[in-house]
Amino acid sequence: MPTRKVIKLCPIKEELKIMKIRQARNINVIAMLNNLLIDNITNKQIIGVPLPKDMIAKFFIEWNFSGKDAYIDFLSQYNGLFFPEGLLLEASAHDIEMEVETFYDLCGRLERYWDITKDNVDIPKKFTMSHIPIADDAAGNEYWINLITGEVVFIEVEYGIPEGVHIVADSFSTFYSALRPMH
């Protein structure tokens, strides 16, 4: 008698959940490949002190945003990077050319710049309570992560908030994977 395969029918919600997990894994693989590309081609300097991953995770424990694990992994590997020649952010979803020069370090620039911004009366408290600075360019424009959605935004300092805010990626993984060496 032939054996019969039993096919488990998943509800649509379960199937979508599985697809999202697979998609997230694919994004992480892409980001890791681009990390290698950047590591091998660009001149970079680690600017922060190494921190244990559990200490970094404790800092972010109250937030559960998309890309959080990838950002924690990045900080545990580098904890702040300076690219003297800069990195170029591919301009697929935005109309301005953007550069990244420095990724902020935890227990250093990240908290310092966040505190300075929180004290700035020109920046809405609602923004500083739901975003954290992660990087900047050579002109002082900054990149921030939305602590609720995980989106990475670029802020043009000459325009401020909200006029100068541009969403550049849906997560840190997507953001980092879109970076390329300038030269």
Regions found by a protein language model. Name each.
Residues 129, 147-152:
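Short, solvent-exposed coil/turn segments at beta-strand boundaries
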Residues 134, 164-169:
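Local beta-strand/beta-hairpin segments that build beta-sheet-rich folds
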Residues 141-147:
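Broad, structure-driven detector of short, well-ordered beta-strand segments within folded domains
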Residues 150-160:
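Intrinsically disordered, low-complexity regulatory segments enriched in Ser/Thr/Pro
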